[in-house]
Amino acid sequence: MRASLFPLSTSKETPADAEIVSHQLMLRAGMIRKLAAGLYTWTPLGLRVLRKVEQIVREEMDRAGAHELLMPAVQPAELWQESTRWDKYGPELLRLKDRHERDFCFGPTHEEVITDYVRREVKSYRQLPLNLYQIQTKFRDEIRPRFGVMRAREFLMKDAYSFHLDDDCLARTYQVMYETYTRIFERTGLVFRAVAADSGNIGGSVSHEFHVLAESGEDAVAFSDESDYAANVELAEAVAPAGEAPPPAETMRRVDTPGARTIDDLVRDYGLPIEKTVKTLVVHGADGGLVALLVRGDHSLNDVKATTLPQVAEPLVMAGEEEIRAAVGAGPGSLGPVELPLPCVVDRSVAVMSDFAAGANQDDAHYFGINWGRDVALPEVADLREVVAGDPSPDGRGTLEIARGIEVGHIFQLGREYSEKMKATVLNEAGDAQTVTMGCYGIGVSRVVAAAIEQNHDDNGIIWPAPIAPFQLALVPIGMNRSEAVTEQAEKLYAELQAEGVEVFFDDRDARPGVKFADMELIGIPHRLVIGDRGLKNGVVEYRGRRDSESTDVPLAELSAFLRERLG
């Protein structure tokens, strides 16, 4: 591609409303242009990258035996009412009416549509298993779209749905899709982790997320430094400490603590080690009352784990100060297990503490030197806290590391969440109607592009992994309009590289070398060749990889072999 014929539009300025690196660089490189909040036009440059990601996804899905189809983006309300999601989904669902006042929505997902398709088309168990996918535009009406295409309202997604006669068959296909996703993200050249995850609004039981690791990631993932264990921090098990609580060394005493409302206040004002403190958090109970959850002072309550407790209401709701005072007679900063008139659950780490400090259930007072059994009965024990770096890995191999991740893929074993409600059945071998079981597998195709930039950039711009770069090689002639030798060699090389199938961006613009170099670094082309009079006199061209700190002179006679090695 000749730059003189390509609509390249770069900028030195960072847009004021672009908060994260990928948004900034995609705008500066001219990959996207904002139309409205959360809506973007993909320019020819950006679309080349998007199509590369899409092609990798399509090739691997086809290789896995899935079949591509295309469903309507606009969906009738009746299907969503069948699944009961019409009223549950919330304002993110863009609802609209046609000229006949019939209700529709712009699909954020397609579980209902695909289930309707299968219940109409698939009649016999002999037609199963069946795995169907599409790559299509989705819309979610985010309350605050931000971060460019990372959290846009309109986005490109690959969504796949598998149908099975039984759970064993679903589990086999799920494993195939897990391996397929692993190949997809390996092929994009990104560093990622597959983690056990919560199913969220989609529903179902078994679930894994695929995260591209990047400091700007919204999610925290935990993974072992010695094994393949990885999980979303929300689901990662905090292993119970070994052994029992040490024997008491102190006598419990009540201490006036005026103004001490937080753990930090206690640690600062009374010289307590934070790991010797306990905080008491009060939440709404499933029976309409309140429940106290106790975690160590330096630990954080894990909301997902708390919600799984049968005595805790779902969704998790923290009790307000008035509710707490009405039940206990003290404010939330003065609560503890001794004579607490609420049902309690304590974290595993709290259960093995001795001589610890907690609120006295009176304002401005705490108990120091509390011990289980002697001063208060040990209540129910559960895994309540979020894991931290250095915790033992739950699989017994190594310790946990915590990293930020950007979710780019999610796979679910849905089970019969949708098929039962929508009566999707087939005739089994005995001739009886049997409800099918389902799997669901999504990849945010446009989000992968942004995540790749978050993971691969420097101060000068994007550093594309080679498999998804818009072009493989930038050919940059210097003084082309003034030197016949440069023009002749550049044109010759351009023709040869094209003939070999190399995706070349030939910067034949009448621009200063500095402008050309800055643009090529900004848009992130992995390889660059510079042709100039000085080099040609010595029979060489200058090569530089996008990640290289120095350039290399390559003899023209060796260039073909050199590039074959570099370009793979």
UniProtKB/Swiss-Prot annotation:
Keyword Metal-binding: no
Primary location: cytoplasm
Enzyme Commission (EC) number: 6.1.1.15
Any one cellular-component term (Gene Ontology): cytosol
Alphabetically ordered keywords of this record: Aminoacyl-tRNA synthetase, ATP-binding, Cytoplasm, Ligase, Nucleotide-binding, Protein biosynthesis
Alphabetized SUPFAM superfamilies for the sequence: Class II aaRS ABD-related, Class II aaRS and biotin synthetases, YbaK/ProRS associated domain
Top-level EC class: ligase
A Pfam family hit: tRNA-synt_2b
Signal sequence bounds: none
Gene Ontology molecular function: aminoacyl-tRNA deacylase activity; ATP binding; proline-tRNA ligase activity
Subcellular location as annotated: Cytoplasm
InterPro entries for the chain: aa-tRNA-synt_IIb, aa-tRNA-synth_II, aa-tRNA-synth_II/BPL/LPL, Anticodon-bd, Anticodon-bd_dom_sf, Pro-tRNA-ligase_IIa, Pro-tRNA-synth_IIa_bac-type, Pro-tRNA-Synthase_IIa_type1
Alphabetical GO biological process terms: prolyl-tRNA aminoacylation
Catalytic activity: tRNA(Pro) + L-proline + ATP = L-prolyl-tRNA(Pro) + AMP + diphosphate
Entry similarity comment: Belongs to the class-II aminoacyl-tRNA synthetase family. ProS type 1 subfamily.
NCBIfam families: PRK09194.1, proS_fam_II
HAMAP family: Pro_tRNA_synth_type1
Assembly and oligomerization: Homodimer.
Role, per record: Catalyzes the attachment of proline to tRNA(Pro) in a two-step reaction: proline is first activated by ATP to form Pro-AMP and then transferred to the acceptor end of tRNA(Pro). As ProRS can inadvertently accommodate and process non-cognate amino acids such as alanine and cysteine, to avoid such errors it has two additional distinct editing activities against alanine. One activity is designated as 'pretransfer' editing and involves the tRNA(Pro)-independent hydrolysis of activated Ala-AMP.
UniProt remark on domains: Consists of three domains: the N-terminal catalytic domain, the editing domain and the C-terminal anticodon-binding domain.
Protein name as catalogued: Proline--tRNA ligase
